[in-house]
Amino acid sequence: MKSKCNQSTLKRVIVSAMTLGSAALGTQSYADTGTSIMNVSATVKHSCSIDTNPMAFGAYDGVVANASNALEATATVISTCTSGATAVITMNAGTYAGLGSDDTPIRRMTSGAGNYLVYQVYSDVARKTVWGNTAPTGVGIAGTGSPQTHKVYGSIPSAQIIPEGDYSDQIIVTITY
């Protein structure tokens, strides 16, 4: 007896056989598994950064406007420390400092012609606590991982009779952690 097989059926049989054969060749059989633990670690070190904004006093008049009242201004110091870090922010005496100590420096601005305008920076709004260059006279902080703003309070004492001009100074602000 002769069986009839059309070409379409034959093609489907061949394609099916090839597909099954290639699938069988690409499949691997595994007998068992093994495991291991991979330890992953990192060390986070304390870190801090600091940024400052300028302190601009404006016009000072030791004869009339500031004859009996100090001229005051504020600025900010922004610190960011890793969470849990402890740090202290200190300020040096400035470029043109007079006599004094690191704890209570005599800060001065100059016009560049040998003339000086005495000023001071403080860590409190009452302007009683000088912001100095030592740990006890600096400002202590606890890191949170987020920026923290610290206000700086400045004062130019009254009745300084000095030549007119533009006076300036630079204070180095340091964060130690």
Question: Where do the PLM segments sit?
Answer:
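Bacterial N-terminal signal peptides
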Residues: 15-24
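N-terminal signal peptide c-region/cleavage motif recognized by signal peptidases
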Residues: 26-28
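N-terminal small/polar-rich segments of proteins
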Residues: 30-111, 137-177
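Predominantly extracellular/luminal cell-surface or secreted proteins
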Residues: 92-94, 120-124
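Solvent-exposed strand-loop boundary residues in beta-sheet-rich modules
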Residues: 113, 125-127
